[in-house]
Amino acid sequence: MNFGGFATPERNIIFDINDLDETLPAPFEWDLKRLAASVAIAAEHLALSKSDAARIVTDVVREYRERMCNYGWMRALDVWYDRIDLQKYEDRTGDPEIVAAARKRLAQRIEQEKRKNVPDHLYPKLVSEEGEQPRIKDEPPLIFHPTEDMAPGLGTDYSEAIASYRESLPEHVRVLFDRFHFFDLAIKVVGVGSVGTMCAVGLFLAADNDPLFLQVKEARPSVLEPYTGKSLHANHGERVIAGQRLMQTASDVFLGWTRGRNGRDFYVRQLRDMKLSAVIEDWDTGMLRQYGRMCAHALSRAHARSGDAATIAGYMGSGQTFDDAICEFAMEYCSQNRSDFRAFVSAIREGRVEAQIES
């Protein structure tokens, strides 16, 4: 659903939108429809009844609408400073037992991530010191060093791309970045949502082998461009970062962008940095509802920052008509998703689509 927890520069854990590869100015309801449809599909995945799924989706849309109404009455600075602190989050209508259980699990996850993401933990897992200088370990097929055939034009001299990235950083962050020196870069296999794009991990070291791991991810034209027009940004990495800085309440200090010698655009951020994502497999109705409302809260806050909250709230109104309309769309989308998946599986079985099934 493109929402999750991550660390702020102050090392607090907040909940927010965490994937903005397609970000572009567009109608607010497109994002809300996508969230509502995702919740409906998640409910079906959990084998919840259609009536339960519809109630959860309606609750999620209502949360968005009511939060947006509140933002419409708030001072501009208060909207801008508002954030969802995961460790202090209070669900306004959730079951106290569910909230308490979720908070306990969250505290355990946060402690696990803190241990996993400290440099002393990451460095020995990702870096080998067997050669003349530190080097990222090859772990094919997930992490490997590119050849010219694998990545035409990527080359081995990244000085121009690094200099361009440095220029994209705020001046005060450049002072910090200049303490680190580039040592290595390796290709990193991306997730399902980014298949076909290039992603790499860069190793930078300061004094005493103090590491900084940067993820360099390809940014292509937004899928929204055919419907909204081209981005105002010449570099699509800049488009992603501009949207991220606008809509997130706090962002990675190393967010930046660059362009490779092969003409590809990239955006840059720290690798990992205490990222928390939802694992819904063992969830029940109450937990999905709570998570969906948190997503709606984060989305409404992002839209209130980037748009006019009062205008959006006025468009949605104070009744349930808007909620029901979005819910109807989400349930129909879920049905279409189910039909599409069945057709996909059928095509595999009939040999019309090749697929590799991992054991």
Feature map (PLM): residue ranges:
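Conserved ATP-binding subdomain of kinase catalytic cores across diverse folds
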Residues: M1-R115, E160-S359
